[in-house]
Regions:
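Conserved RNA-binding domains used in RNP assembly and mRNA/RNA metabolism
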Residues: 1-94
Length: 94
């Protein structure tokens, strides 16, 4: 698979994104802005993977296929916890 044009991370503002955290949480939502040491998401799904039997990858793939189910109007996520950021549309399934 050949990569398409690689965006700069600032181009992710306004996009639906996946934030993988060091903890067993994954956040999905629209990346609005950076506020100091936090990323602000709107219409966010804050998902604690300890609450389900599914894996992080399966949960994100399901969200890509069926859409995000927001449980937060706004979510401020600490950059210290974020280990990865990607557009939801860039998630690759089997």
């Amino acid at each position: 698979m050949e990569p398409s044009v690689v965006p700069s991370w600032q181009e992710l503002f306004g996009e639906l994104v996946v934030l993988d955290l060091a903890s067993p949480y994954v956040y999905l939502g629209r990346l609005v802005e950076r506020q100091g040491d936090f990323l602000l998401l709107s219409d966010a799904d804050a998902h604690d993977l300890r609450d389900t039997q599914t894996t992080r990858e399966k949960y994100v793939l399901a969200s890509r296929g069926h859409g995000i189910n927001p449980n937060r109007r706004w979510a401020w996520v600490s950059l210290r916890e974020v280990v990865g950021v990607s557009r939801l549309d860039d998630v690759i399934g089997d």
